[in-house]
């Protein structure tokens, strides 16, 4: 076939025209002679804002060519935030969507196209900008004070200059990108310029077209005598009644390539552009807007000359044809002049037509509409009618020309090649003419080759699940048509010629089957990518996994079966080629004909080792080579027994010939070994040992609960009987020998001697070892002894799985018969829903086609995100076919016009983004008061307004949300208006809301405005005290903890006062009271002085000393005294005496929780007892010194907050604060309640474990080397999972804050509240093994830095991080393990600490804003649990279920862990616990 040198192929096209949603509907309307200019009802016009005065005007024409859906756009598909989409000119939006459909029609994926792609486009002036956007502001002020950024941004999104470059940016096109503006001829000029660019080599493919919208849209127009618009609302080109045109809306594009390149690429060619030309009228005409017939004739003649054709061969001309009395005669005059230069007589007249009679004048898109119409005429070999043509305008003098007007639909009769001209003339004089020719016969005809036999893989892509569903339905409909495309061509077009995002693969057999599968909601032959289920926009390019996720598994002995892979051998030449190569090698080594053995042999023969191992090697090697041709690569290999040799060969350890020799020798020597038997047992390796006779050995561990044992046949038979009687599942393994046991020892020397003479190389792909269960080192791989030991050693397949499944989202591909290895993987404890298995071959019992199974596997891999090269599936004669385009989401993005007031347009408001809603500042203040960061709230609001979304995920990337450099400028300007200093560059460095907030706050903190805490006379409160006060949840006066001592009645008040004076003066925290001012708290510490604050109450008369009644009376007095402490400004420590009659008195120190912790109570008890001893002995009271007092500690907190050790933990706390996925308040019926509970809204449930159950807990601690806290938290996770649901719950823990970050701070003897509070994520799951659950909690706690000290410092002292952490939700659960409460000491000492008396009143009621507070402590040898719950948030039934389930879950956890006990923990992980003899010493507790 001769290819014209300058010919350009139209390989793709798309458009939306009045009354037509796509090109197919457009042709249907043309063929039926449908006019798409409609009459508008009075109500429609009123709704559009047309006034009654206008409606009454006789000059107002109520007609318009309407385009549906101009307000709709799939913003997510193109990466536009909602607000940006709303402001973007709809002409640009439609052009974007049509450009994508045109590329799809061309079978061109820009990301895979090997060359540059240019864009030549045009749009009309933006009526949307003028009528809609700018109607919201004072037009006199738009530019009154000069251009500002937001005006520039607004014009940038609406001006016609940016149409083409917007396409290039959206699709990452690197060729020329030119906006063309020549008025009505613009889009045809764009086609001409694109052709020149292709011919000059500037680009290899080009998009060309135009977009024009009349806005306001659903309105008519005014006419007047002599105007160019029709008074009747009909466009009647060439007709005697022609009185003007009707302007309408539309968009169209074509995709162009050099004809030779299109043919070479196998493109579908719609038509050929033989040549084109443009020129201008100049001034030789009646006026600027008037046409020039001579210039029009010149441009047509030049186009003919460029095309190298004679005008007599042009049988149709799509005219500019506006239907105006002036324009039509001039156009025919020019045509006559151009065509009369021909020296060849015509055999038939040239037909004229004008699409404007159907759809009106589309302004800048008029030329592309005419071009697409003409291309459709060429494709269909038919000419539609030019509507409303009854008799010619006599001014045309058609009877004196070679032209006739097509007045009805009919075939395009032509003696030779069909050729056509398309004209478009612009106001201002730029004329364009294009010569079209029908596509070459070879390119236009569907291949005559028969449909290839066998299954096909259909691939579909979409960015949302909804779009995928629409695509499936549309493709099914296309396949169901009578003249639908060949299935192989559909598969080729979708696989090789479409861009893929979220994916779906379907294996189908014919068109009918394909349609059925596509329409089915679920089908075994359909595989859908995970992202397509969630309905969110996503891009495969961003989420596509690498080959590192893929692991190939090669099965061994026992997987073989007769006929395996026969279907692949018969249908896949690559498989057959490699099978034949291996079979020939094994025949030379062994004399065995594998073709006969594998495809036609018997099962008994194939079970022989000397046959099965070569057969498996051959099949699996050929299968691996076949899958390799599809581009599927693995990041690692695991081979099972014989399979390890296949893996090593593919990894390059053995060359193929060496591998064949090695496997042949190994199989022969194994076959010659003593016979034996093997069975698979449903027990773990430790449990099965007790059942094994002496000569039966462990052969393989496939998963922790299943293993294989082997030995002599008689002993295996007896073992099977014993296991069956014990109710333990056992099954025979198809093996004739006791593989991987000492029974193989006799062959080892000969095998190792052979291997030592072979050359082994380090692997190109990582290998896992059967011998060690871990990665093979290069040294191990090349060591013959390792390969020899593998023969007689158990296969540690479970350990190999343990290694690969530790990584998330692994895809395990079984490269061999059946699915035994992937089945073991799915039973492994580390298997999760993020992992996937794929089997390349069928199970022997499945009656399915081998190739069907293989293609299903490829489809499943592809849908999982693995790159698959579908080239091997390309038909012998591939043919690109037309298929439905992407179903864009029809979402409205529109700003309605405002005809009454001037306000600010969205996205254009005098220098800042869309205006702040009333009350936003108040909302910010409220948010700040609720503990949220004011900076973040402000930035959240700015981002939301600029992006046009209601909320912004604080960890979402600004640019992933659709942000760009211009929007970054908008955000910086809006932030400046809020008093925040941000540069556009900051958005690149800190692209998330969280990171930007931290950066802004850090900048503020470094500005030097903060007053150093050391300069303050009264120090600010430390972070944990701030935690208490910041929430404002409890009456600070009531939150007191008692410290109770029994005193001998002979101890008098002077002694008590002396002791108290010494102790209170020794510890400054006991002289503390807080002063609050507008939410800012200071600590005031009184000077040392004699202690006078002592109250005295007596037990009522008649109560016997030492009786239970006396103790109850004392407790009542103490509880009453504690309740009386309601003055928030009073000192935080008070002392009371409860005097008994004749028995001991009780001294109660009521100390506020904010100045004492468990260690403080121990220090105070020791000091008081010491002081009493010294006083009663007549000695001076001298207490052990305090190194760092409370006041000094408080002053140092600010410095500690900026200590590197604290700052280094920022990322840890920020990351961990967002891990929770389960919130009790959300998972349970009651809504989340932000306000703190009152005392009467809290309820306590208590339970006690028996001494025996508590001992069991101690035994578990010693066995597993895990702390009591770890075991209790693991049980709590199980309890929540069983009663509420599975997920990750945020739990607040308490830590010991006395281990500080600076060596010059010593708090070991300091009285004060140093408890740290910090959140940890707790996984709540029911399916996790006990040891795994303990390990998970242990690792979580072990990762907590510095006992959680840094969290409080960063949360309450270091402002930048404080705002970030403060925005996080309060954990639902507070958990505290208080350790051992010592029992009442015996003896007659005059002063004794009374823990037994303290216990009932020692803790204040909770109220820190948690839904549940669980307090656990040891007392009297038993474990006690107090469940406090907020009755507004937690139903009583749920709380009772938690309280009831916890002991059961704890016991089950310990029992399970003991059953699966292991001792692999490092000694460094042994953790201590508070034990008897210490009140509570949290500093002795490790983190996990």
From Swiss-Prot:
Entry-linked Gene3D superfamilies: 3.30.70.3290, 3.40.47.10, ACP-like (1.10.1200.10), Chloramphenicol acetyltransferase-like domain (3.30.559.10), Malonyl-Coenzyme A Acyl Carrier Protein, domain 2 (3.40.366.10), Nonribosomal peptide synthetase, condensation domain (3.30.559.30)
Phenotype reported upon loss of the gene: Deletion of this gene results in phthiocerol dimycocerosates (DIM) deficiency and decreases the ability of the bacteria to infect macrophages.
Residue positions binding NADP(+): 1286-1331
Residues at the active site: 184, 320, 361, 641
Named cofactor requirement(s): NADP(+); pantetheine 4'-phosphate
O-(pantetheine 4'-phosphoryl)serine: residues bearing it: 965
Residues covered by the Carrier domain: 930-1004
Biological pathway: Lipid metabolism; fatty acid biosynthesis
InterPro entries in UniProt: Ac_transferase_dom_sf, ACP-like_sf, Acyl_transferase_dom, Acyl_Trfase/lysoPLipase, CAT-like_dom_sf, Condensatn, Ketoacyl_synth_AS, Ketoacyl_synth_C
Co-factor remark: Binds 1 phosphopantetheine covalently.
Region (Acyltransferase): 551-868
Gene Ontology terms: cellular component: cytoplasm; peptidoglycan-based cell wall; plasma membrane; polyketide synthase complex
Keyword Transferase in record: yes
Catalytic activity: icosanoyl-[(phenol)carboxyphthiodiolenone synthase] + 2 (S)-methylmalonyl-CoA + 3 malonyl-CoA + 5 NADPH + 10 H(+) = C32-carboxyphthiodiolenone-[(phenol)carboxyphthiodiolenone synthase] + 5 CO2 + 5 NADP(+) + 5 CoA + 2 H2O; docosanoyl-[(phenol)carboxyphthiodiolenone synthase] + 2 (S)-methylmalonyl-CoA + 3 malonyl-CoA + 5 NADPH + 10 H(+) = C34-carboxyphthiodiolenone-[(phenol)carboxyphthiodiolenone synthase] + 5 CO2 + 5 NADP(+) + 5 CoA + 2 H2O; 17-(4-hydroxyphenyl)heptadecanoyl-[(phenol)carboxyphthiodiolenone synthase] + 2 (S)-methylmalonyl-CoA + 3 malonyl-CoA + 5 NADPH + 10 H(+) = C35-(phenol)carboxyphthiodiolenone-[(phenol)carboxyphthiodiolenone synthase] + 5 CO2 + 5 NADP(+) + 5 CoA + 2 H2O; 19-(4-hydroxyphenyl)nonadecanoyl-[(phenol)carboxyphthiodiolenone synthase] + 2 (S)-methylmalonyl-CoA + 3 malonyl-CoA + 5 NADPH + 10 H(+) = C37-(phenol)carboxyphthiodiolenone-[(phenol)carboxyphthiodiolenone synthase] + 5 CO2 + 5 NADP(+) + 5 CoA + 2 H2O
GO biological process: Actinobacterium-type cell wall biogenesis; DIM/DIP cell wall layer assembly; fatty acid biosynthetic process; lipid biosynthetic process
Superkingdom of the organism of origin: Bacteria
UniProt xrefs under Pfam families: Acyl_transf_1, Condensation, KAsynt_C_assoc, ketoacyl-synt, Ketoacyl-synt_C, PP-binding
N-acetylserine found at: 2
Domain (Ketosynthase family 3 (KS3)): residue spans on this chain: 5-438
GO function terms (MF aspect): 3-oxoacyl-[acyl-carrier-protein] synthase activity; fatty acid synthase activity; oxidoreductase activity; phosphopantetheine binding
EC number: 2.3.1.292
Key words of the record: Acetylation, Fatty acid metabolism, Lipid metabolism, Multifunctional enzyme, NADP, Oxidoreductase, Phosphopantetheine, Phosphoprotein, Transferase
Leftover remarks: Was identified as a high-confidence drug target.
Function description: Part of the PpsABCDE complex involved in the biosynthesis of the lipid core common to phthiocerols and phenolphthiocerols by successive additions of malonyl-CoA or methylmalonyl-CoA extender units. PpsA can accept as substrate the activated forms of either icosanoyl (C20), docosanoyl (C22) or lignoceroyl (C24) groups from FadD26, or a (4-hydroxyphenyl)-C17 or (4-hydroxyphenyl)-C19 fatty acyl from FadD29. PpsA initiates the biosynthesis and extends its substrate using a malonyl-CoA extender unit. The PpsB and PpsC proteins add the second and third malonyl-CoA extender units.
Subunit relationships: The C-terminal region interacts with TesA. Interacts with MmpL7.
Record protein name field: Phenolphthiocerol/phthiocerol polyketide synthase subunit E
Gene: ppsE
